[in-house]
């Protein structure tokens, strides 16, 4: 009975975090105008090499805070990292995001989970107001230069602006009739959405998008692998 209560409480916390992220993505449309410059999947793929380089730099950050060199970061190591990066959230929010991103239940954050976790914290820690001078200054330039373009890709795919991706919009965007030479095969677009839609609900939140997007970008893969697989 206790286990069921704990799981229910955790699910409620995760649902609240998911809803908060969705609201943040809606608010972000005016803060990240770069999403309007994206026209097709090719324009997204062109960002992959720079993002891949940035992710390699993030690995250096990860390794510098993995004090016991076990390939994971625990909650205390994460807090030290966030303090150094000047990213501030409440302890409760950090703990909730930490467990939410520990998708394999290993009680430690691995590198791919760390990227997603750091991006979520960066996004939620930033002010929502476009007029705030801190909104473009918070956090190191390294983190901003990597995560801002990823947010813009999500906003590009989120055509209805509700903070969630739905299958019809994503497929329509990737098969944009205005760019016939850059259209993705239908089986590829369906597969890409399924990679994001873990619960097979037809809706994808920012966290699920992040995990899928990291695998698309890769750290060692060639750019054309994304379109041909």
From Swiss-Prot:
Key words, A-Z: Calcium, Metal-binding, Repeat
Stored SMART domains: EFh (SM00054)
Span of the signal peptide: none
Annotated residues for binding of Ca(2+): 66, 68, 70, 72, 77
CDD domains referenced in this protein's UniProt entry, alphabetically: EFh
Entries under InterPro entries matching the protein: CML21-like, EF-hand-dom_pair, EF_Hand_1_Ca_BS, EF_hand_dom
Domain EF-hand: 53-88, 89-124, 145-180, 184-219
Any one GO molecular function term: calcium ion binding
PANTHER family: TROPONIN
Functional summary from the UniProt entry: Potential calcium sensor.
Protein name in the entry: Probable calcium-binding protein CML22
Gene source species: Arabidopsis thaliana (Mouse-ear cress)
Lineage, broadest ranks: Eukaryota, Viridiplantae, Streptophyta, Embryophyta, Tracheophyta
Gene behind the chain: CML22
């Amino acid at each position: 009975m206790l286990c069921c209560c704990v799981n229910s409480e955790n699910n409620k916390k995760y649902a609240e975090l998911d809803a908060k992220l969705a609201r943040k993505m809606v608010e972000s449309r005016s803060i990240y105008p770069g999403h309007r410059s994206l026209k097709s999947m090719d324009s997204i793929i062109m960002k992959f090499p720079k993002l891949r380089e940035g992710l390699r730099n993030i690995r250096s950050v990860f390794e510098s805070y993995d004090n016991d060199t076990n390939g994971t970061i625990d909650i205390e190591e994460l807090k030290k990292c966030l303090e150094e990066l000047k990213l501030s959230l409440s302890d409760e929010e950090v703990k909730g995001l930490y467990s939410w991103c520990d998708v394999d239940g290993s009680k430690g954050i691995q590198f791919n989970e760390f990227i997603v976790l750091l991006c979520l914290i960066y996004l939620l820690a930033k002010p929502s107001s476009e007029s705030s001078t801190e909104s473009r200054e918070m956090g190191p330039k390294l983190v901003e230069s990597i995560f801002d373009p990823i947010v813009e890709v999500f906003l590009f795919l989120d055509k209805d602006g509700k903070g969630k991706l739905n299958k019809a919009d994503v497929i329509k965007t990737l098969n944009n009739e205005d760019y016939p030479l850059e259209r993705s095969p239908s089986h590829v677009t369906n597969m890409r959405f399924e990679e994001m839609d873990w619960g097979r609900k037809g809706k994808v939140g920012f966290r699920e998008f992040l995990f899928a997007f990291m695998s698309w970008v890769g750290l060692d893969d060639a750019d054309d692998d994304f379109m041909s697989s």
